[in-house]
């Protein structure tokens, strides 16, 4: 690691105030189009004659399609253009989101959901790569955490919006209205306001551009050279990160897709009320994401921050069902569970972005996201199957999802020496430390 005297002081805010907000908006709409099926289940189940297991499969098959472009998406973002790749995929996912309103049977539903997964699949690793081109390592957990607020923001918007649409329309209306957003909002913002690198952005000041490029150049100069993508597949660190991410996605997506059903079972009421209550846990999640990411960047203990947040989420999830008869307490515990199940994100991806040489980061993050997101298929499907098997009880589902979160945390803590890279403390005015601090 270069001496701290060579590390430039942070300059400018455009990367925080322009790039990240646009990326958030794009992924909010993406996340909305993949998870609004949770609100459609009630009406769709009646129209298409589906049981809970079939609904879980329809929700989860998205993640099988999601595999297809993960590694290519990250690789193309690194070697070609994140802006162009994501811009094209926004238009393709919009087509399949809109077509969801017109399915006439279960087979068509599975096909459309699968293709929606294919279309959205490469966007996540591509945006991760884009952020790595704009933020030095010492800012990256905060940058990833800030961007990943999109998941909580999407839920806050999707839940009441979907509930409101269902008060005057049906599940087809839900897909029609929300399927327009990729064309109306996401694509124009992305194509007009995003640049692949600071050197291509006219809206970045010279000082900020020099700070970013100088910082990244010095980090990349210290990085080991790479012989090819095969190194990603040979890395035990990458495969453990895949396992961690799989366990997390089982827990998170199992909770996220079944949350509207859990809330409706707990409190009853109209779709509008269910939507409003379902959104409330994500306010906690936004706070958890920012606090955990900021603390992780400050200490450099990324693995520990992942484990602690997942443990909190797992315990709170089981308690929320155990105390389901006390509605206010149950909703509060669900909120804590959602915060824990999301707050891992910034520290996790900060670790992943540093686990391999810079040239392979896109492919590595694509592999982690691709195979890890199979948990997004398993969680909803297993959750639905367990509810059918237990006569509609969510307790067994909650226990399985919580155990999965705990397992993710336990595997992550074994990576603390490999994935927690040295971090550089920003210079304190008037004081230049002798060397950067290394934290484990």
Could you tell me what each predicted segment is?
Residues 79-90, 297-310:
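Cytoplasmic membrane-interface "Motif A"-like loop-to-helix N-cap segments
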Residues 302-351:
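C-terminal transmembrane helical hairpin of 12-TM major facilitator-type secondary transporters
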Residues 112-150:
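Cytoplasmic helix-loop-helix junction between adjacent transmembrane helices
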Residues 37-38, 233-290, 345, 349, ...:
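Extracytoplasmic gate region of multi-pass secondary transporters
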Residues 147-201:
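Helix-loop-helix hairpin linking two adjacent transmembrane segments in secondary transporters
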Residues 69-81, 288-301, 387:
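Helix-to-loop junctions at the C-terminal end of transmembrane segments
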Residues 68-107:
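Conserved MFS/SLC helix-loop-helix module at the cytosolic interface between two early adjacent transmembrane helices
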Residues 49, 81, 102-108, 119, ...:
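Helix-breaking motifs and short loop linkers at transmembrane-helix boundaries and internal kinks
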């Amino acid at each position: 690691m270069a001496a701290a005297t060579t590390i430039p002081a942070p300059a400018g805010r455009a990367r925080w105030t322009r790039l990240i907000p646009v990326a958030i908006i794009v992924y909010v709409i993406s996340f909305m189009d993949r998870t609004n099926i949770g609100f459609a289940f009630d009406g769709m189940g009646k129209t298409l004659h589906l049981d809970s297991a079939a609904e879980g499969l329809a929700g989860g098959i998205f993640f099988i399609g999601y595999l297809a472009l993960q590694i290519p998406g990250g690789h193309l973002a690194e070697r070609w253009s994140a802006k162009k790749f994501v811009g094209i995929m926004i238009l393709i996912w919009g087509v399949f989101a809109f077509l969801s309103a017109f399915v006439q049977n279960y087979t068509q539903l599975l096909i459309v959901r699968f293709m929606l997964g294919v279309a959205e699949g490469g966007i996540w690793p591509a945006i991760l790569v884009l952020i790595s081109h704009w933020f030095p390592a010492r800012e990256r957990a905060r940058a990833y955490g800030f961007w990943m607020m999109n998941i909580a923001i999407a839920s806050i918007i999707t839940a009441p919006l979907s509930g409101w649409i269902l008060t005057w329309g049906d599940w087809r209306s839900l897909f029609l209205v929300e399927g327009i957003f990729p064309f109306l909002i996401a694509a124009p913002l992305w194509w007009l306001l995003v640049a692949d690198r600071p050197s291509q952005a006219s809206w970045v000041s010279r000082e900020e551009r020099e700070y970013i490029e100088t910082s990244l150049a010095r980090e990349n100069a210290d990085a080991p050279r790479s012989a090819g993508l095969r190194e990603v597949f040979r890395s035990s660190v990458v495969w453990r990160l895949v396992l961690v991410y799989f366990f997390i996605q089982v827990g998170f997506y199992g909770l996220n897709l079944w949350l509207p059903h859990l809330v409706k079972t707990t409190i009853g009421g109209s779709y509008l009320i269910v939507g409003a209550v379902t959104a409330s846990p994500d306010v906690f999640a936004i706070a958890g994401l920012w606090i955990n990411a900021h603390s992780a960047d400050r200490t450099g203990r990324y693995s520990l921050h992942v484990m602690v947040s997942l443990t909190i989420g797992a315990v709170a999830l089981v308690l929320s069902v155990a105390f389901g008869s006390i509605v206010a307490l149950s909703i509060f515990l669900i909120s804590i569970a959602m915060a824990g199940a999301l707050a891992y994100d910034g520290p996790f991806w900060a670790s992943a972005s540093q686990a391999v040489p810079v040239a392979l980061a896109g492919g590595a993050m694509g592999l982690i996201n691709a195979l890890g997101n199979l948990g997004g298929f398993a969680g909803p499907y297993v959750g639905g199957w367990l509810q059918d098997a237990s006569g509609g009880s969510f307790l067994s589902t909650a226990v399985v999802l919580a155990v999965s979160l705990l397992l993710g945390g336990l595997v992550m803590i074994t990576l603390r020496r490999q994935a927690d890279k040295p971090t550089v403390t920003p210079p304190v005015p008037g004081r230049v430390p002798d060397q950067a601090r290394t934290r484990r």
